[in-house]
Amino acid sequence: KRAGYDPRRLDAVFVSHLHVDHFGGLPFLFIEFLHRRPREKPLHIAGPPQTEEKVRQLFLLMYGGSPARELPPVCFHILEPDQRATVEGIQVLPFRVPHQTQEISLGLKVQLAGKQILYSGDSAWSELFIDHARGVDLFLCECSFYDRGTGNHVRYIELLNDLPRLECKKLVLTHLGEEMLARKEELAVTVAEDGMVIEI
């Protein structure tokens, strides 16, 4: 809303994993589509198994009603690791990343109109990113910590060590924690900002 972007222009949303900071905005979109700006075309939502169930549960938790409560026009797609899929004309290769031990967390390599974007999702640093970043136009990589951390998020010093091996055309860091934000001016890599537009 702040950017003046009409959410009806969204064709598809890709969910990397089912932690609420990665899909918690969907109920707000649903309310917008139900009451303020009705959609004619369905919004395609693609994510790991149980995405539809979790999204519906969150919507009911936030706004009430029965399990049969109407959603705006939406179409859910299940993304399985290492199984290519096409969602609303967008080709996607999901792959499992080391973030959770039981539930599935995905990295996503998407292709549209001859351009490729790699998204790490939430993950520890992995050799998978070296492989999948090769030749992509943009690698959007989470980087929660500078040199400390819990082992399930990227640390900047690890990424920096492998920077010469990353053969992507552009690298942008996102999902920064407090330490990373405090040291943002020291970083040798572009950092994502709210409202940022990246041309590829």
Protein language model regions, located:
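Binuclear metal-dependent hydrolase catalytic cores
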Residues: 1-118, 184-200
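Glycine- and other small-residue-rich loops at beta-strand/loop junctions that grip anionic moieties
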Residues: 48, 121, 174
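Active-site glycine- and acidic-residue-rich loops that bind
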Residues: 118-124
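Cap/insert and terminal regions of metallo-dependent hydrolase folds
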Residues: 124-200
